[in-house]
Amino acid sequence: MKTISIYTDGACSGNPGPGGWGAVLFHGDRVKEIYGGEPDTTNQRMEIKAVIEALKALKVSGWDVTVFSDSAYVVNAFNQHWIENWQRNGWRNSKKDAVANQDLWRELVHLTGLNRVRLEKVKGHAGNEWNERCDQLARQGIRELNGEG
């Protein structure tokens, strides 16, 4: 079976404010780094966006993909079946409010359907080499938005 591991992270300078996302993708001995940013966003949106952009970068389907994220928001949405509940409830949360970041969640649902994707929580800012690298990439996305390249 073809397997890929992905580390992701999002960051925001102010919340809301300029934000960035970063991801590192591993397949065998190949490593690919990607990042980007948005001028007016939130940290949570950037955490989701990092996973979306990483899955878009795969350009494959039917693979086993493990995504490592330090975002409890993203990991719990999948592993605690929040997304399934939101969909069943017409994209409303348990308080009957519209789900925040619905546009990104819908895109992520589509992309996760192309491969066998599982999410695992990693502790942020705890010395995990690849989580730290994703944080650096996300902050680079913010710097480039601010013209600091």
Per-range role (PLM):
Residues 26-28, 70:
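Generic beta-structure capping elements
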Residues 21-25:
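Short beta-strand scaffold segments in enzyme catalytic cores
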Residues 8-18, 52-133, 137, 141-142, ...:
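RNase H catalytic domain
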Residues 45, 49-53:
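Short amphipathic alpha-helical face segments that pack within enzyme cores
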Residues 1-5:
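Extreme N-terminal starter segment of soluble prokaryotic enzymes
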Residues 29-46:
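A short, polar/acidic, helix/strand-boundary loop motif
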